[in-house]
Amino acid sequence: MEYKTTAKLVIQACDKDLPGVFGHGCVLLLQGIAREHSLNRAAKSMGMAYSKAWRIVNEAEGQLGCKLIERDGARGSTLTPAGERAIEVYEELQADINDIIATKADASSLASKSS
């Protein structure tokens, strides 16, 4: 039987009183906002209620202490520079984690074959 090792990065403030976390789902939502220029359309494309998307963004902004999106009423939403940077940092960290897992998995695979 084959197994695959994975890990999902979650960024959370040390202050336990702050709600939510910044993780993969939030990154996907922010990427959707960047693509669709709308929180509502991004949420719909993910099969998510607008209210849930709004809550995810608000909680992530609270966790990170910065605005991730600019809301412009009927004209939609765009990512702030902080929102763009948050995606970039998350993707870099997740790639590093994936590289570490791949390296460790290769090493353990080699060790088990030589036994």
Predicted regions and their residues:
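Alpha-helical linker/hinge and terminal dimerization helices associated
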Residues: 86-108
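Residues within the DNA-recognition helix of helix-turn-helix
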Residues: 56
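A short LG(V/I)-centered, amphipathic sequence patch enriched
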Residues: 62-78
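Short alpha-helical "packing" element that flanks the helix-turn-helix/winged-helix DNA-binding module
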Residues: 29-30
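Short helix-boundary/capping micro-motifs
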Residues: 33-41
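Helix-turn-helix DNA-binding motif, specifically the short coil turn and the N-cap/start of the second
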Residues: 49
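Short, Lys/Arg-enriched N-terminal segment that forms or immediately precedes the first helix
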Residues: 2-18
